[in-house]
Each structure stands twice: as C-alpha cells, then as structure tokens.
Amino acid sequence: MSKTVTAQLPEIRDELAAFYKDLHRNPELSLQETRTAGLLSKRLREAGFDEVAEGIGVTGVVGVLRNGEGPVVMLRADFDALPVEEKTGLPYASQVRGVDHEGRDVPVMHACGHDMHAACLTGAAMLLARSRDQWRGTLLVVFQPAEELAVGARGMVDDGLFERFPEPEIVLGQHVGPLPAGVIGYGTGPVMAAADSLDLTLHGRGAHGSRPEASIDPVLMAANVVTRLQGIVAREVPPAETAVVTVGRLQAGTKDNIIPDKAELGINVRTFTPAIRDKVRDAIERIATAEAQASGAAEPPEFAWTGAAPALVSDPEATQATVAAFAEHFGQQRIMTMPQVNASEDVGVFGEVLGVPTVFWFWGGLDTETVLGALKEDRLDELPSNHSPHFAPVVEPTLSTGVEALVVAALTWLADA
C-alpha cells in the first residue's frame, strides 16, 4: 500500500523542493515562527484537511484529516530555527537576522534541519490526503514550535492540544542528521537524552582587587564549582549509565581590579533515566551549596532550572513494527541501528502525557560519497552536523526519503481501506 501512495511523490517533488528552499531562506526563531506557520496551515488547507488551526502553543499548527473509522495517528515535525550565522554558501542560504528570547540581535539559520522536517511532513500530509481510498482512520498532523527551547511540545499540550483535537494512539516523528542521504537509522528504548538547563547564581561579597581579604570571592567559588562538577559523572554515576554535565557559560564582574559580588553559571545536563537525572541534579545543587557554605557566603546559591525535556523513548514493540515496514518499503540495506544520542528532543512529551507509544527515527541528509570519503580518511568528525553553520542537507534524496518514511510509518498504524 505504501508504494501506491508514494508513487505520487514525483508529482509534488519539485513543489516541495521549492517550499523547502523557501523555508531555509526564511528561518524564524522559536515562538516567532509566524510566517512559517502561515505557510504550513495554508498547505494543509489546500490539501483538504478537515480542520486546520494556528496559534496552538503560541505558533503551533494542527491539521486533522478524518477518513472513517479507525486509529488516530499523529505525525509531528518541528519548524523553529537557531541563532546561528549560516556559512553554507548555498544560493538559498539565510541572511536573516532576528531578536532572540533574551532581546539580542542575532543571525538566524535553519542549522538543525527543522525546515526539512516541516517540508517532509507537508509532503506526507499531501500524499495521504490524496490517497484516502488507501486507508481508514484519522490523521493528526502537528507542526510544533520552539523545539530548540524545549518548551514547544509542553506549550501545545498546555494550550489544550489533546482537548481540542483527537487524542492519538501513537506519536510518530523523525530527525534529519549527518548520515548518508537516503539511510534510515533507529533505536529502541531511550534514544535521545533528557535535557535540563540550570542558571546558577553564586553570591559573594565584592571588594577592590587589591583587598581580596575583604571579599567573599564568587569567581573563586565558581571555579571550584566548575571543577567539582566534573566529579559527578566520573564518581557518582555508575559506569554503565550515561550522563553529561557541561558548564557552557560563566559570567562574573566587569573589571579586572574589582572582585564582583556574584557569579553566574549556565549548566546543561543530559541523562537517560529518571533516577540518574535526579541524582545528577541533586549533586549539582549539593556541590554549589557546599561551596558557598565553605566560602562563608552570606546568601545561598540560587538555582533556576529551565528548558527541561524528558528522555525520548522510542517504544520497542511499536518501533520494531515501524522499522519492519521501512525495510519492506526501502529495502533492508537502507536501514541501520543507532546508538543513543546525547542530544535531546521534546517530542516525547506528547506520548508521555497521553501514555501512548512514541516511535522516533533518524534519516540521513549528507551526500553519500562525501560521507564515504570522510569515513575512508577517518574524518567523520569534520563533517557538518546539526547546529553547525555549515549544516544543510542535500535536497535529494533527503526530501523524498523523509516524505516516504512518514507516509510508511503512518500507514503502518492507520487501518487498511
């Protein structure tokens, strides 16, 4: 059945490629994706969806296609961009600038492939709408904003996504990455890490740089905390478990001869299980609190945890059924297993709040010959990957593979006509 549906892809391939390039040329930051949302909703209406709604979770788009009795299946794609200056040199490269959520003027680029995600889901929605004689059930298409801030999925849920629209029995999604174009990679169980961000403020007492004895130096406190945090993964997390603690930002003071009264650290945590997640978070707070006490700080540290996303769990049974359909459609030679990925995705929120399975897979966007050449020369780490200013998937076969994968996955769970 999937071959019958995807046989129509050549009829819309050029249109989709142009749409993808337009999205790439005109990226929008998280929760500012108004132009993109308007284009996506227009496409769904033109495809004949029964319901199309914008503004779900600020800028999210939802489409409902009812086609008789049968399962409710959800296809999801994100569509926000990043504050990155594009360096791909493509004729459709972004030259856009924007204002980020902290009020800074920044360059904007689709450096994570969300434009490809959105174009592929648009294509899959068009093909499934054209082929209603092939399946039965309800298709729920969700274009999610603000994945890069890890707040988009929760925002849509909190805005009544599953009260206003049919509750799906399964959630399906995908992510393009630095694999050979046309290849599909998958894992089962926890496939992407939980993410937590912490803004930590250490309070001290300021003084002139010539009189350190009059201070409680928050810079020294911060340095000790940064060093001590490295012991969490090395000495508190079991070797068989995976965790990452990264200090990506340390800010203190304005002048070399002034000891400031506070230091701020931006900390990122990645884990795969709730138990390790709690252990690492508790250890960070314990270490910072102990350092402040040891330094004689009058105020305890401030902890502001933000941007939390749960570990993404691809349901083992549902994933195996979907991958079997991929193998039948694409051929086993285009399917590969993947290790766990320490990056994070908030798509898991949807299935988690409903208690239904999520199936998530990856597909390649890099030129195959380029990947093989890098592999031969042991240069794989030099290839542009997600969030790189040089990352841009080759349009084909990336686009066609992404569209077909979504169609195949949806038809695996929708009822036969």
Regions found by a protein language model. Give the residues of each.
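Acidic/His- and Gly-rich active-site-bordering loop/insert found
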Residues: S2-H110, D115, A119-G123, L127-R136
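General structural feature for long, well-ordered alpha-helical segments within catalytic domains
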Residues: I12-F19, Q32-L40, P71, V108, ...
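Divalent metal-coordination and catalytic microenvironments
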Residues: L23, G63, L75, H114, ...
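Hydrophobic/aromatic beta-strand patches that form the interior of the parallel beta-sheet core
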Residues: V73, V142, I170-L172, P357-W361
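Non-cysteine beta-strand/loop elements that form the S-adenosyl-L-methionine
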Residues: M74-R76, E85, L198-L200, W361-G364
